[in-house]
Amino acid sequence: MLKYFGTDGVRGVANAGLTPEMAFKLGRDGGYVLTKDKKDGERAKVLVSRDTRISGQMLEYALISGLLSVGIEVLEVGVITTPGLSYLVRAQGADAGVQISASHNPVEDNGIKFFGSDGLKLSDAKEEEIEKLIDAPEDKLPRPSAEGLGTVTNYHEGASKYLQFIENTLPEELSGIKVVVDGANGAASALISRLFADMGVDFTTIATHPDGLNINDHVGATHTKKLQEEVVKQGAQLGLAFDGDADRCIAVDENGNEVDGDHIMYVIGSYLADHGRLKKDTIVTTVMSNLGFTKALERRGLKNIRTQVGDRYVSEEMRANGYNLGGEQSGHVIISDYHNTGDGMLTGLHLLYVMKDTGKSLSELLSDFKEYPQRLINVPVENKKDWKEHKRITEAIEKVEKELSDEGRIFVRPSGTQSLLRVMTEAPTQELADKYCEEVAKVVEEEMGSN
């Protein structure tokens, strides 16, 4: 288990757990690890970007200082989505990229996420190498002076290049369907109107006026109530919600019902399969995907492969075995024919394209998807790493597993980014899912609760 890196980089409360001093060390040590193999005389190039949090610039300047101190040339992208940065790293032939964002987390939090030259998140081994340098008793990294120091170049035009990339993944404009888009007051806020207008979409927006403090504030992919209300109020056929860094997309159908990542993958995957484009007739998801998703795919003759939680592991499975669609229930969807990471705006537009090309509403496209009732409880804990050592917890889980048999499941895991233990159940009825989830969550709270 890594000390600083979670499933989505290094996160913490800005200026408390994640300080400018830490950002400087991450820039210096991370930059060195990712560029140390450059040939003598070759300058390493790293792209840096952020979301709209008030703490973003504070951490950005500290991080960039660290990168400059080991002689790295920095391209400062400004505010852009995480998948936007990932794309630009590859498009620019950069050695690495760093996004400053805490995704769907509240404004108090922030994070620092590294990408390699391939635009992908780092391996555990690379992150461990960075952590060893952070904790080293003495800083022995190079300290160039004068012409050996790095410089910063403004690269705000990168946003336009990224939007052009997304537009080129679709064969035609997307007029004829009314859409409401929720930008979460995050990184996609300034991009949505440009992209959707260019694609000919009939759209309105909410939560696209960030002020540094309102990111994810009761809006976005994890708070869809306002979007659901707007879709019904405006008589729209589709709602699309992104999170703070727009690496995920949650939809809303024409009746105001939330449509999560499982449902989105089912719609896009079914369309690809119908056109002979779903590789190996398989969709890759994590263990958190609903049982109903797997059963719906089976009825269509399609397969579902599951990985541990984290879109990084979905991506690794897809690349290792040649699959082209995967993601998470939370809305990270990877369509690898176009992009190697979850991209909320790309996903949303391709979902819209399926609706237009089939002439069907979102609810019609999902008519064969029967979801198992599910319950998720996040339990704040003191130490999320040692939960398996608590006998009462493991016994409670075993009891539920025995009673549910193959008609449901229980899944317990630590959050990759917060001090939480997540307890999730699925069962034939909501009553049973609630009952079993509450039973186990109560034991977890009694054994490990932080309150």
Swiss-Prot record:
EC number(s) from the headed UniProt entry: 5.4.2.10
A GO CC annotation given for this chain: cytosol
Active site: 103 (phosphoserine intermediate)
NCBIfam families reported for this sequence: glmM (TIGR01455), PRK10887.1 (NF008139)
Name of the protein in its database record: Phosphoglucosamine mutase
Keyword Phosphoprotein in record: yes
PTM field: Activated by phosphorylation.
PANTHER family: PHOSPHOGLUCOMUTASE (ALPHA-D-GLUCOSE-1,6-BISPHOSPHATE-DEPENDENT), PHOSPHOHEXOSE MUTASE
Similarity comment text for this entry: Belongs to the phosphohexose mutase family.
Organismal lineage: Bacteria, Bacillati, Bacillota, Bacilli, Lactobacillales
GN (gene name): glmM
UniProt keywords, alphabetically: Isomerase, Magnesium, Metal-binding, Phosphoprotein
Entries under Pfam families matching the protein: PGM_PMM_I, PGM_PMM_II, PGM_PMM_III, PGM_PMM_IV
Segments passing through the bilayer: none
A GO BP annotation: peptidoglycan biosynthetic process
Physiological role: Catalyzes the conversion of glucosamine-6-phosphate to glucosamine-1-phosphate.
Record flagged with keyword Phosphoprotein: yes
Annotated GO MF terms: magnesium ion binding; phosphoglucosamine mutase activity; phosphomannomutase activity
Enzymatic reactions: alpha-D-glucosamine 1-phosphate = D-glucosamine 6-phosphate
HAMAP family with a match to the protein in the record: GlmM_B
Post-translational modification Phosphoserine, affected residues: 103
PROSITE patterns the UniProt entry points to: PGM_PMM
Binding-site residues for Mg(2+), renumbered to this chain: 103, 243, 245, 247
Cofactor(s) listed in the protein's UniProt record: Mg(2+)
Cofactor binding, note field: Binds 1 Mg(2+) ion per subunit.
